[in-house]
Amino acid sequence: MISIIMPVYNAGVLLHTAVESVLRQSFADFELLLVDDGSTDGSAALAHELAKKDDRIRVLEQPNAGICAARNLGLQHCRGQWFTFCDDDDTMLPHALETLLVLAKSTGADVVRGGYRLLRANAAGTAVELPHPPGQAIIIHKPAGQGYLQFLQQSGPQFVWNAMY
């Protein structure tokens, strides 16, 4: 099983889109942890409504403490052999989990990282795609943390939401 941790803070309508992209995954053995970080716009209520429709979704709530605290709370409650993150304004391609899992199993990697499309609105409100690196497997045979630190030093921009650990 893969645990997907999604921090939620005042996500509004974006939350539904993000959750639907997770539910459409070709690999269905996952749990989705929606961690509400003290939203004030009804996002927590929406998270609970979404959880009623699919038993793979669990909702955790905490007072507003920031995205890192929300991710850490999710880590404390995840049950999967693997875990990944998906932010509340992200969408996952339908084969994202399957692709990462196949790469991890076929290489024996400790961490796999996927490619991504980063879209930002320009001044005119039009989506602009920014450059992104391809996916890769990270095989660590060094003491815990040492190999990953070396990987981070050799890589470009780092995000937690395009990797599976």
Across the structure, where does each feature detected by a protein language model lie?
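Nucleotide-sugar donor-binding/catalytic module of glycosyltransferases
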Residues: 1-165
